Curated annotation (Swiss-Prot):
TM region(s), chain numbering: none
Originating species: Penicillium terrestre
Record's miscellaneous remark: The macrophorins cluster contains a single gene insertion (encoding for the terpene cyclase macJ) compared with the yanuthone cluster that produces the linear compound yanuthone.
Residues annotated as domain Ketosynthase family 3 (KS3): 45-474
Lineage start: Eukaryota, Fungi, Dikarya, Ascomycota, Pezizomycotina
Pathway note: Secondary metabolite biosynthesis; terpenoid biosynthesis
Protein name (Swiss-Prot/TrEMBL): 6-methylsalicylic acid synthase
UniProt keywords, alphabetically: Methyltransferase, Multifunctional enzyme, Phosphopantetheine, Phosphoprotein, Transferase
Length: 1783
């Protein structure tokens, strides 16, 4: 759907004449000039102007002008509510339908409340549907209001602009947030009140206050009041204020029905005798406010003046919603006092008037006391009163601002529209006496004296007691400014440049058509110049731009129509902006040859700027050459070289003057031949008088050679031409025009011979119209005379803008333009090609040929095309026989459309503009969150999901003993809270089926259960449970299975009815059972085991707190619902699910997926199930896998008995991972592959501190003689980054004894160096290296940092090179080893890292540590001990025999004396975990010590002494924090904060427990594998972890058994536990997976038992697809690869792709990238803008990972994690992938 915001936005003043239609002329004006001055002299310091407004309300009213027409017609927009809005509530509960049938479903509704133009604001569809429609409407209406105010939103970016929005409805929030399974990440801000103003502030980049106001129905007028106050206080410069309301749910309507506030027919009848309540309405209104004096200075329209406002409260009344007349009276008086006006001066009141029987009389009587009879006004001068509510409804939070907008319109038009729905005046109001009058018909307000402009009051009240009031005044001073808006007769109008733009290319058709339609409707009432200034200065300029040059409205309409139909037009330009235009425009002044007879005549008469240039040059030309330039312009330029030179120079400066007046100055200038004179003037190198002397006196000298020379353009390169004319005296190359053409100059004979020869050879030759052999040695005889002619005449200056030369070999030379320069300019060849190439190298992409006709534009295009593939423009200014001014404006339009800043877009307050010019046309799409649910009929017959059974509607079958339960099962009403998939299908857990039987047969038992066919949840199916006195059966059928009524039913489960409900035992001795079970399992054992055999999720949220076992028995202490999740009315089903799950693990030694298939007997005792139970499982004496289970309370009372539960294996993939195969790895260092061609470095810059300069000297001597220069620098900022073509920066870290300081300093230095290089424009030619030695522990942190640098910025990162001999400079490794993050020199050979499986210890090895064991007589210490990892490690240690554990953490726990009280969830979890460990016999000591603090060593030693514990036998350093920052964003403080717990903490432990500690069995450092794989953003974390690895190696060398464990993510815990899927996606992208805690501990044990292992890398490499690229080189030896399936087509596609190149490859990649973007963002491919940054299109971090994987699998190339950051648009990505695929 496409809607226009203001296509007919014309506010015609009541006293305005027809010729002012469409302008900003106000309603009140004065013809007295003295009155104007008086108005300006008035003190307006406290006055606030309303300079713009917009609205969207029922009745298809989308603008203030449409609203005014609707009011005049007494429009009534009331009607029926769209029924779909309440459907989710009808579906939510069977009783709702009856209630909703009695709820008022009438009112005032928007037809398109679900519609939004998300693409316009670069909001993804996913986020858009999670945004409250109020946010969407407010955003669009705020944009419309700014356009109405003539403010381009882009001008407000970063400004002190505030947003105050009234809001009171949270219907959408209730609707979507109560649908818990589908709650989305964007719904927080997306549905919050604060999100309404904040969304506007965010998207427009506004820096002022942004506040949501909730004062019920007074909200929006309260918002306006606070906005006014903020402006007056100087708190904000501009305010966007308003309110919005949306009626999306029935809740509040139901409340108001109960309160009797709503009329039965949903209509408002303000002031009518039949008024019995109001009709609720929805919509939005926004006004733009600015201080009045500032508005006048800025040339803004002033719609009205906000003179005063006030807000108060009712205080205590008969009820909180009862009105208080006294409060309403007082707030009105307060507003009048603020406005400094008397109450009898008010002409109109916009009343609140909600149409309630109590409210209307109360309010009217109060207003009469102020404005009516109580004001003392004369009966002949009543005050008119009205209310907008009968027209558009009561907009509640938006009501006040809509009343304000109506009041502004009343003052603008000087009329009061008739009151809608007013039949009989309210008899409870004394209308005759109170001097207030509702308008029954259109009323024209009396003007009164000029000293008293029209005024209006606006009242708005909230049902919570807030009362608000505002006073506005018509602005009588606008006529002063209207004088400068005088209309320009269209017939005499100069050409105008109309600038249109859209954010996406497909919008221009509707935009152009809308403007064309509006111009037709205006019928000449607005000038083309006014339209042009409005579009250029008062509208946003988007990415896709269009410019139209027109000299009449009719011409503009025709061109717009062509643009709308995509028909090319001579005077229409279209382009899109990009980064290429950033440097600005280059003006190129061409030389001899552009002349034509009438070339300056039009401009001389039409352009004052051109005329001034001609008149300035006229006397000089007359004096120097003896002819009149003015006469020549009229008579036509003669064909004489000397005169052509002067007139060409005149045209250059004249066109430049016009161009600067229309476009603004250039960034750089260059001249071609004669054109260098004008370039010198425009750049400031010469004055125009000096340059004119150069041209005229040289032209006079040329007379000697006139008729003696010739020139020709030849289609040969300059080098080819020189070779061919080497044997032809009298000719030479005069101009190097382009790579394929040049101009040859010489004698007439020589040129004649050459031309004939080349034509015979098929070379294109074209004569140049000249008879002088310019730019040849033939002119050397003129050198002396020219020097003499210019002697003492020139005083050249340094140019004030970039000036390039085509006469010098160095086009950037700053050589002064003295006489010698002009001699050289006359004789030397013109080096146009190399000069344009230099400009391109310097970043210029926009070129304008300043000449009367283009003669070198084509050459410029050829040169740029040869030089770069970037977009560029080269445009002429004039074209022979084309209208001159239109042509120049077209050039300005091309610059603007390309993205260059041009003068027409600069805001000029003196230029006329019109708010009636159409604004943005919205391209709406529907975005409305689909809320899950079923129909009311379905709900009425369904089971209750929270009961965790399938018992639906119960029916006793007549004449039988049978009972039938019927229900409907689907995803939304599954009877279990979690997930329970089997082979990809969600099935109902066996526990639910057993619970269904038990509840149906209660209090009897269930026997001989046969679980035959799983009950699948989706697609939807009918369920029947049928039972009699003997049997019970569950059957099901798909809803669509109706072809055979009987055969479509499937028997799922059967059972027989038991005789009694008594278990075989009534009590279990828990302690005795636990005593005989020696094996302690981890609490997560069952979940981990089931995950390993293919159970990816659990149906219920039970959790094991203690688990012991033997070969045949298990005992588990189980929390049935530990997190108190909803969806479980009782806990028995969750406990039964735990029982079936745990029992299936009895056979864990033979891992496979087992499911219950039969149960001999199930009996429940019928008591409430407690939160915590014990489950005792025993293998039965049977030939099959069968178990007996008893569920008891903590005291041992039996709650349920399950006898003979048989399990059968389920066919499918078994993922058992009890072995460490593929799990544990170590880093190996094989020799690196060497490149065939070395990198060449012209210079090596050493970045180092003083202490290492001696080492640098050694390195410099080794480099000598290799043609490589060197330099030494202490600061990265001093590096010579722009002076060498190729350069290596080598960072040498400083050596100190303070390890932590060394680590932090060296990391900071290297990051700073990288940041400096990245900020350099020449970074592709620079490589950054770091050189370290493992002997210095403090440098080891750089290893991790280097790996992240390699990931984030491979374009600058050389590598980190670790030396075995620090005296040998690694030049060979730097030059021959490519794409390596870290290089290790060992045995003189450069090596790179690879992961290889860790070799297990030999069976009888005595070296190295023994298998990890724990002693109850020792103490074990864990840092980070209160984190999830630390707690998990402690739990595992206890299961392995540890009994004394210190948990070190920065945080402290509450005193143990209050542990039994309630605490925050995180603290409660820690306390519960510790207590559960202590119940197992362990002693846990939580100790609050910050291990990274300098006092940590002292504090730790003191704590150990105080606690008097046995010696510490094991240390685990698991402390750490993660703060992701990309390299460019890193700050030293943030980096050190991450390093401290890792490095300082490890050093503290190293000090307290040195390698010589006799009691220490293990010293384990928790590191991360993320550093090896280069996780982006983790530079600080990787640096800290690489230090831990080095510390373990260092301790090993001292005889210790330290180990660093480089973990992948632990599933469900640690720093990735709350990553919302981002971490899992990143792991997948990097080629690995996470591990379960059980796998982690198994790996730990395995590594500890491996001889000599100082580290272990714990991860699983995922299987790669057959054609998928290796995600990281370090995985090369361990990553398995899937076999290519038979018939798999990817290989064929890849082969076809490999055959593509050039344009075909680019087209292929473009299709792929756009498809991947489309899929990721859920938008159509044709809406993917190639030039918009993907984050601006709504792509967040999680989407980015999916996008990368999609690209990687489609293009079969490695896609790095920072790719989208470096190449943010589709265009950039296509360029990058084309380069990669070509290689």
């Amino acid at each position: 759907m496409i809607t226009s915001t203001s296509s007919t936005e014309v506010l015609t003043p009541a006293n305005g004449s027809d010729d002012s239609k469409g302008t900003t002329t106000p309603a009140t004006s004065s013809g007295d000039p003295e009155m104007h001055d008086d108005l300006l002299r008035n003190d307006t310091h406290d006055d606030v102007a309303i300079i713009g407004m917009a609205c969207r309300v029922p009745g298809d009213v989308n603008s203030p002008s449409a609203l005014w027409q609707f009011l005049l017609e007494k429009g009534d927009a009331s009607g029926d509510m769209p029924t779909w809005r309440w459907d989710p509530y009808r579906q939510r509960h069977p009783r709702n339908a009856a209630v909703l049938a009695e709820t008022t479903a009438k009112g005032y509704f928007l037809n398109d409340i679900d519609q939004f133009d998300a693409a316009f604001f670069a909001i993804s569809p996913r986020e858009a549907e999670q945004m409250d429609p109020q946010q969407r409407i407010a955003l669009e209406v705020a944009w419309e209001a700014l356009e109405n105010a003539g403010i381009s939103p882009s001008r407000l970016a970063g400004s002190n602009t505030s947003v105050y929005m009234g809001v009171n409805s949270d219907d959408y929030a209730k609707l979507v947030l109560e649908d818990l399974p589908d709650v989305g990440a964007h719904m927080g801000v997306g549905t919050a009140y604060c999100g309404i103003p904040s969304r506007i502030s965010y998207l427009l980049d506004l820096m002022g206050p942004s506040v949501a106001m909730d004062a019920a129905c007074a909200s929006s007028l309260v918002a306006v009041h606070h906005a006014r106050q903020a402006i007056r206080a100087g708190e904000t410069d501009l305010a966007i204020a308003g309110g919005v309301n949306a009626l999306l749910g029935p809740g509040l309507t139901r409340v108001l029905d109960e309160a009797g506030a709503i009329s039965a027919d949903g209509k408002c009848r303000s002031f009518d005798d039949s008024a019995s309540g109001y009709g609720r309405g929805e919509g939005a209104g926004v006004v733009i406010l600015k201080r009045l004096d500032k508005a006048l200075t800025d040339g803004d329209q002033v719609l009205a003046v906000l003179k005063g406002s006030a807000v108060a409260s009712d205080g205590k009344t008969l009820g909180i919603m009862a009105p208080n007349a006294q409060a309403q009276l007082l707030v009105a008086q307060k507003a009048l006092k603020e406005a400094k006006v008397t109450s009898d001066s008010i002409n109109y009141i916009e009343a609140h008037a909600t149409s309630t029987s109590l409210g209307d009389p109360t309010e009217t009587n109060a207003l009469a006391e102020v404005y009516g009879v109580g004001s003392g006004r004369h009966p002949s001068d009543p005050c008119y009163i009205g209310s907008i509510k009968p027209n558009i409804g009561h907009l509640e939070a938006g009501a006040g601002v809509m009343g304000l907008i109506k009041a502004v319109l009343v003052l603008r038009y000087g009329e009061v529209p008739p009151q809608a729905n007013l039949q009989t005046l309210n008899s409870k109001i004394a209308w005759k006496e109170n001097l207030l009058r509702p308008a029954r018909e259109l009323v024209t307000l009396p003007r009164g004296a000029l000293s008293r402009p029209l005024r209006a009051a606006i009242a708005s009240y909230g049902y919570s007691g807030t009362v608000s009031h505002a006073i506005i005044e018509a602005f009588a001073g606008q006529s002063l400014f209207a004088e400068r808006l005088a209309q320009i007769p269209d017939s005499d109008a100069a050409p105008a440049l109309l600038l249109l733009s859209v954010p996406q290319a497909n919008r221009i058709s509707t935009t152009a058509a809308g403007l064309s339609r509006w111009l037709r409707d205006m019928d000449g009432a607005v000038s083309l110049a006014t339209v042009a200034s409005t579009l250029s200065q008062r509208r946003m300029h988007h990415r896709f731009r269009h410019a139209i040059v027109a000299d009449s409205v009719a011409n503009a309409i025709a061109t717009l129509d062509d643009l709308a139909k995509d028909v090319p037009s001579r005077w229409a330009i279209s382009d899109r902006i990009g980064s290429e235009a950033g440097k600005g425009a280059v003006w190129v002044f061409s030389g001899h040859g552009a002349q034509w007879p009438d070339m300056g005549r039009e401009l001389f008469h039409s352009s004052p700027a051109f005329g001034e240039v001609v008149r300035n040059l006229e006397p000089i030309i007359q004096a120097e050459l003896g002819f009149s330039a003015i006469e020549t312009l009229h008579a036509g330029c003669p064909d004489r070289t000397d005169l052509i030179q002067a007139m060409t120079f005149l045209m250059h400066l004249g066109i430049a003057a016009v161009l600067e007046a229309e476009s603004g100055p250039p960034t750089a200038v260059v001249g071609h031949s004669l054109g260098e004179a004008a370039a010198a003037v425009v750049s400031g190198a010469l004055t125009w008088h000096e340059a004119a002397l150069v041209v005229c006196r040289r032209a006079r000298l040329y007379r000697e050679f006139m008729g003696q020379g010739a020139m020709a353009l030849v289609r040969l390169s300059a080098s080819e031409a020189r070779a061919r004319i080497a044997t032809h005296p009298g000719a030479s190359v005069a101009i190097e025009t382009s790579p394929t053409a040049c101009v040859v100059s010489g004698t007439v004979d020589a040129l004649q011979r050459l031309s004939e020869q080349w034509l015979e050879e098929g070379v294109e030759v074209r004569a140049v119209a000249t008879d002088v052999p310019f730019h040849t040695p033939l002119l050397e005889k003129l050198a002396g005379p020219l020097r003499g002619a210019l002697k003492n005449e020139l005083h050249p200056q340094v140019p004030h803008r970039a000036l390039y030369s085509t006469s010098l070999l160095d086009p950037r030379s700053d050589l002064l333009r003295d006489a010698e320069y002009w001699v050289m300019n006359m004789i030397q060849p013109v080096l146009l090609q190399s000069t344009v190439a230099a400009l391109v190298d310097d970043g210029f992409r926009a070129f304008v040929e300043v000449a009367s006709h283009p003669i070198i534009t084509h050459s410029i295009v050829e040169t740029i095309s040869e030089q770069t593939t970037d977009r560029f423009i080269a445009t002429p200014t004039m074209v022979r026989k084309q209208p001159a001014l239109k042509s120049i404006l077209a050039a300005v339009g091309r610059l603007h459309c390309f993205g260059c800043a041009v003068k027409p877009t600069d805001l000029d307050p003196t230029v006329p503009w019109s708010s009636s010019v159409p604004g943005t046309i919205w391209h709406h799409q529907s975005f409305y969150r689909a809320v899950s649910g079923m129909t009311a009929a379905q709900l009425a017959s369904t089971h209750k999901p929270a009961a965790n059974d399938l018992l639906g509607t119960r029916t006793a079958l007549w004449g039988t003993e049978e009972v039938l339960y019927q229900t409907r099962l689907e995803e939304d009403n599954r009877p279990f809270p979690g997930r329970h998939p089997l082979h990809g299908s969600e099935i109902v857990p066996a526990a639910v089926l057993l619970r269904t039987f038990l509840r149906a047969l209660s209090p009897r038992s269930v026997e001989e259960v046969s679980l035959q066919v799983p009950v699948v949840v989706s697609p939807a199916r009918e369920i029947q449970i049928r039972h009699n006195t003997r049997n019970i059966t569950i059957t099901s059928r798909l809803e669509e299975s109706t072809s055979n009524e009987h055969n479509s039913w499937l028997v799922n489960t059967t059972a027989t009815v038991g005789a009694d409900a008594t278990p075989s035992v009534s009590h279990v001795d828990i302690a005795e059972v636990a005593k005989r079970l020696p094996q302690k399992l981890s609490d997560s054992f069952s979940i981990d085991y089931l995950a390993s055999v293919g159970v990816s999720a659990m149906g219920f949220p039970w959790r094991v707190a203690h688990h012991v076992a033997s070969d045949n028995e298990m005992l588990a202490r189980v929390h049935a619902n530990p997190d108190s999740l909803p969806g479980m009315d009782d806990l028995l089903t969750s406990v039964m699910d735990a029982a079936t799950s745990i029992a299936s693990t009895l056979w864990h030694s033979k891992p496979r997926l087992r499911m219950p298939t039969a149960v001999r007997r199930v009996v429940a005792v019928g008591v409430a199930t407690p939160q915590v139970v014990y489950i005792h499982c025993t293998k039965a004496q049977s030939s099959v896998d069968e178990a007996d289970v008893i569920i008891s309370s903590e005291e041992g009372m039996v709650l349920m008995e399950i006898q003979g539960m048989a399990f059968a294996g389920v066919e499918g993939e078994s993922l058992s991972r009890k072995s460490t195969s593929g799990l544990v790895h170590q880093i190996s260092w094989p020799p690196a592959a060497l490149a065939e061609e070395p990198l060449e470095f012209a210079h090596i810059a050493f970045l180092t501190a003083d202490a290492t300069k001696a080492q640098v000297g050694t390195y410099q001597r080794q480099i000598e003689g290799r043609g490589i220069s060197t330099s030494i620098h202490e600061r990265a900022s001093d590096l010579p980054l722009t002076t060498h073509s190729s350069m290596a920066v080598v960072y040498l870290p400083q050596f100190t004894d303070r390890i932590f300081d060394t680590a932090t300093r060296s990391c900071n230095d290297l990051v700073t160096a990288a940041q400096v290089i990245l900020s350099s424009s020449d970074k592709p030619t620079i490589r950054l290296f770091a050189v370290t030695s493992e002997s210095n522990l403090g440098h080891s942190a750089l290893t991790g940092l280097g790996r992240i640098l390699h990931t984030e910025h491979p374009e600058i990162w050389g590598s980190l090179i670790d030396l075995e001999d620090p005296s040998v400079f690694p030049l060979m490794a730097m030059r021959y080893v490519r794409n390596a993050d870290v290089i290790k020199i060992e045995d003189g050979v450069p090596r790179t890292a690879r992961l290889r499986p860790l070799r297990p210890a030999p069976p009888h090895s005595t070296a190295g540590p023994a298998t990890l064991t724990f002693s109850p007589a020792s103490t074990y210490l864990i840092t980070g001990g209160l984190g999830s990892l630390g707690i998990s490690v402690a739990q595992w240690m206890v299961t392995q025999g540890a009994r004394r554990i210190l948990l070190l953490s920065r945080r402290s726990l509450p005193p143990r004396s209050i542990w039994t009280a309630s605490h925050k969830p995180g603290t409660q979890f820690i306390i519960d975990s510790i207590l559960s460990l202590e119940r197992l016999g362990a002693t846990i000591h939580p100790v609050a010590i910050d291990i990274s603090h300098p006092s940590a060593v002292t504090n730790l030693r003191s704590a150990l002494t105080t606690l008097s514990l046995p010696p510490v036998a094991g240390v685990v350093h698991a402390a750490g924090i993660l703060r992701d920052q990309l390299i460019e964003q890193i700050t030293p403080d943030a980096f050190e904060a991450v390093l401290a717990p890792k490095i300082a903490g490890a050093l503290a432990l190293h000090t307290v427990f040195p390698p010589s500690s006799p009691d220490l069995d293990f010293f384990v450092l928790f590191s991360s594998c993320g550093q090896l794989l280069g996780f982006p953003g983790q530079a600080s974390y990787a640096s800290g972890n690489s230090f831990l690895d080095a510390l373990a190696r260092s301790r090993r060398k001292e005889g210790d058994n330290a180990i660093s464990l480089l973990w992948t993510s632990w599933r469900g815990m640690g720093m990735g536990a709350s990553s919302n899927g981002a971490l899992e996606a990143e792991l997948y992208a990097r080629g690995i997976t996470d591990v379960t805690p059980d796998e982690a501990f198994l790996a730990w044990s395995s590594i500890s038992g491996t001889e000599g292992a100082d580290h272990g890398v714990v991860l699983r490499a995922r299987p790669l697809e057959s054609g998928e690229p290796l995600p990281h080189a370090i995985l090369r030896d361990i990553a398995p690869r899937k076999e290519k399936a038979v018939g798999e087509g990817n290989g064929e596609n890849e082969e076809q792709r490999k055959k593509l190149s050039g344009k075909e490859l680019a087209e292929y990649v473009l299709v792929v990238v756009k498809k991947c973007v489309s899929t990721t963002l859920s938008i159509p491919e044709d809406e993917v803008d190639e030039t918009v940054a993907l984050p601006e299109m709504g792509m967040d971090s999680v989407m980015t990972v999916n996008f990368r994987m999609s690209l990687q699998q489609t293009l079969t190339v490695s896609v790095g994690p920072t790719l989208v950051w470096k190449y943010p648009t589709v265009h950039h990505l296509v360029e990058y992938f084309c380069q990669v695929l070509d290689e």
